[in-house]
A protein has these predicted regions:
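Charge-biased, low-complexity intrinsically disordered regions
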Residues: 1-60, 76-91, 96-101
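Hydrophobic transmembrane alpha-helix bundles
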Residues: 66-67, 100-104
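Conserved small/polar residues in nucleotide/adenosyl-binding loops
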Residues: 105-110
Length: 110
C-alpha cells in the first residue's frame, strides 16, 4: 500500500493551478509561434506579437496569462491500493485556494 500525505496533494494541486494559468502547453505555443511567423497581415501579426509578449511576461513574472483565470475543475485518477493521510477533498480544495490566491488571482471561485 502506498501512502500519500494530504500536504503533498495540496502542494501539487497549488503548483498545477499556477502552471495552468501562467504557461501554455507546448503545442499551443508552437502553433502561436508558427502563426506569428506565417502571418502576412501587419495588424494581425502585431496582435499575435502582443499575445506572445503577454505569454512571455506571464511566464517570467509568474502572472496569469489572462485576468480571467476561470474556475478550476480537478480530475483525479487514484489507484485502489493508495491511502491518503488526511482529507483528500480538503487537500484538493486547499491546493486550489492556494494556487489561485498566492499570486493574487481572481477570487470569484476560490
Amino acid at each position: 500500500m502506498r501512502t500519500i500525505s494530504a500536504q503533498q496533494i495540496t502542494d501539487t494541486v497549488a503548483r498545477l493551478c499556477i502552471e495552468a494559468n501562467t504557461r501554455l502547453p507546448r503545442d499551443v505555443q508552437e502553433a502561436l509561434d508558427k502563426a506569428r511567423a506565417e502571418e502576412p497581415w501587419p495588424l494581425a501579426k502585431n496582435t499575435l506579437d502582443l499575445l506572445w509578449s503577454n505569454l512571455a511576461a506571464a511566464k517570467e513574472e509568474n502572472l496569469p496569462i489572462c485576468q480571467d483565470t476561470g474556475m478550476a475543475c480537478v480530475f483525479v485518477e487514484l489507484g485502489t491500493d493508495v491511502h491518503i493521510d488526511g482529507s483528500f477533498e480538503a487537500a484538493i480544495h486547499e491546493g486550489v485556494r492556494r494556487g489561485y490566491t498566492c499570486l493574487l488571482y481572481t477570487s470569484r471561485c476560490v
